[in-house]
Each structure stands twice: as structure tokens, then as C-alpha cells.
């Protein structure tokens, strides 16, 4: 066997070290962002108002990273409101201090102050979102998170020609903080929004708009495009369509799916969906539409937000060249069921669906809204949100700090695992089941297998609820209409390739079962992502204990953690 000269061996070692450093740097980049929270005047629907923004943009800037990257975001508060930012769907493994919900994991960033969010993107790739997580500020303080695969790792589907971020939202002519504050004072529901938006604009068919207004997506015939679609609306489940074009779903909530074709998407607040669109139509402009889904007797904004898909070499700019789209009926439950039934995890060798097959902790949580007595309210009652008949009261000290430092009197660990009052949840149950108030949490040991059945209730009216769990992804193993039956319902569960996500819509008058593993120590918020329901108290939190190893332990709090 020939022996390499010393200089040749040193050269090879140096080359190997360089390649190793390149590989490590490719997977361990630190990305720096600065978010300045500032007021800006914005004109929509014939009127102008000041809104909170990040860096003066609405929606805010897109945060780009790759799987494995460390992300540093300095948030500077230049406005008169307290602010926090939540990185919706980012797992925050052991870094719960940076999760963002006010008074759950941190005190707000006060006017004139700043906070450096510091987290790593671990085992995730796809589309998520960031948004303010205090009061109703996320109405305008929100934006996209685009997590690209590691360098050299392809998508598990044909690579698109280009990608585009599509942020769906709502617009109020009034100040949104005034809207919810007045509603809370009176004890009633808030005013609905005045329009739906696509990338911040109601679109070319809205009040005071011209045919050229709104977001425009330019395409070339024969090319395939990936749309990263985010529902950043406060209170509405939304349908999304593109006139004359089929959509191929390839990912939801930053998890790859088995691809399937559809002409209509259903996206609840907080959810994301990536679709491929083939530009296979003739020259012209084609309408994109966003419209509400509500299959309960609840008032929602029925305005359709629009944008245009514009083919290259389209000569005419008049409305005559615009292909319109017909939104689904507002109560199109059959379209929603077909869409959600089509969602399955990819469950490939590279992207397995690690569904817990056994259950250590089983919870049945009823979710809904009810009424409590309120002598000062306009009707003598106050609308409240509940989980297991508990209306959550926000503390003045963050629960994570109280947990970490063993501060007494901030929360109690007696959140009920099953309903305290059992009744026909989706039938003719009690119409005035007074709730209990409390800052109650449910404690979980590290790495337990957890099943949560989310059961809608009809105390006022059955209604869908988009439930978001911080700190974890979960598998949606089952759903059904009516009341969950612990004896028969589990036989319908999908434990092979259920969809994995961080936000799930509990169907109107039905139930959804999710499973996850409590492998992330800290305090993790779970709440309805209809902001009005969260304001009313439809929320709770899990406290997850540390594991035995340092890698299973919550990191210490940062030195610049905001103080209350």
C-alpha cells in the first residue's frame, strides 16, 4: 500500500476541513432581523387610519431561514402599546422564553424598549407565520416565515419555477383595539371586519378601487408556481380560490402532505397551506378570491377579498380581460369536509409520521362560548369563552417565570382533564352554564404520549374553533360529528398517516382528536385562534416538566427578558 507524502496528506486534511466547515456553516447559519414596531397611515376602503406595523409594512416583512438555522430578531417598540411577537408554529425546543404570548411566556415589550428573540429552526421546513400576541394587535402586526430545506435537500415534489407568499387577512375601518375594548366593556360580540384582504389589500373589486389595485401575481404560461398561503385573519375561517386553475396541496403548517388536487382551500386563522399552481390558461388576468366559511348562525364579514394572477404578454388591462371566480357558499360544510378528509401526512422514509400509538394522558376538552351574569353589561350578561367550563384569566406575572422560579399564587395546576359538567354537548344542553374563572394549567411529565379530544359545544350555538397549540406539532388522528364516544370513536382513528399540524379547526357540532408527545419542557399556550374567542377566555396552558438530561431541560431565561 502506497504511503502519501506528508505535504499531500496535509493538503487533503486541509481540503477535508474546509469541506466540513462549509457543510457546518451551510446548516448552522445565524440570521439577523430587526423589527421596528411603528405607526403608519394606511388607506383602504376609501378611508385612512393609523395602524401598527413592523418596519412600516402591512403585512410585515417575510422572515427567511433554512432548517437548522439560528434566528435572532431584535424587536424594538416605538409605539404607545405594549407588544410581543409570537413565531407561530416554530417548535421553540427548550426556548419557550422566546415563544411570545404575553403573560404566558414573557412580559410585554414596553414602549421605548426592545427584546432579542433567539431561537433555532429544528426539524422544520415550510411556511409558518409570525404575529403580535397581545390584545388584537396581530390584526396588522403579522407576516410570513419561510423555512427553506437544508442546502442540497430538494422538495419531495417537482421544484416550482417561482414561489410567492400570499397572506390572507381582515381590515377594519375602525381601530381594532377600540373595537374589542368596546365589546368587552359591553359584554357583547365585537363589530365584524369591513373587508378581507390578500397581502394587505381588499383588491380590485373593493370600494374606491380601480381594476389595477391590489396584489398582482405575474406568471408565464407553462410554468409551475408555489403559493405559500397564510391565514392571518383575526376571526374568520377562509376559502381560497384561483379562477380557472387547479391547486395541488403539498404542505400544511410546515409539514409535507400527500399531494392532492382541489379548486378550493379551507384555511383557519393561524394555518398555512402550500400549493402548486400550473399556469396553463390563455393570456389574461384571473381573479384570486378569499371569502369566509361559517356554518353556524354567527355573523361574519361576508366581503370577498381579491387579487389577480396576471399572465405575461397580456395586452389588455381592462376589466374585460379579467376571469372572475365564484366563491363557495358561506356555509359550504361539504367542501370543508372533502378538503380536510383529503389531508394526509407524507409519511415517507425521509419524512415519517411518528404518531403516538399509545396514550399516557387522555383529555376530553369541551370548547365553546357561553354567558355569565354581568350587571354592568348592556344585556346584564357577558359572553365568555370556555374550555371544560373554565374561563381562563390572564395573570399579571408570566406563567413561565412563575413555573421556573416557583413563584406562588400565579396559577394553579387543577385544570380538569374532563368536563366538570357533562351534558349533551352538541344537542339541547343547558343554555346558561355559568363558567368558573381561573388561571388553571395542566401539568405533563416530559415525553408523555398525550391525546386531547376537542369537543365543540352548543351552549349559545355550535361553532367551529381553530385551536392552536404552542410548542408542539400534533397529529389529527380523528374527527366526527356530534358527541365523541370513548368506546366507539377511537375505532375510526387514523394512526398511520394522519395530518400533522399546529392549528386545527374543531368542526361545528363535532369533535377532533389530536395526539402529541410532550417532549418540549416549558409552558405552552393552547387557545382558539379566533381572536374574539381568546379575548373571551377560550384558552388554557400546559406545563411540561424537564426531562432527566440537559438536552431535555428548559434553558435559563435571557438577561434582557422584559419586565412587567
UniProtKB/Swiss-Prot annotation:
Top-rank lineage group of the source organism: Eukaryota
Domain Plastocyanin-like as annotated: residue spans: 36-152, 162-314, 414-548
Source organism of the structure: Oryza sativa subsp. japonica
A Pfam family that the UniProt record links to this protein: Cu-oxidase
Catalyzed chemical reaction(s): 4 hydroquinone + O2 = 4 benzosemiquinone + 2 H2O
Binding site for Cu cation 1: 86, 468
Residue positions with a glycan: 41, 82, 118, 191, 302, 331, 379, 389, 424, 437, 447
Protein name: Laccase-22
Entry binding sites for Cu cation 4: 465, 528, 533
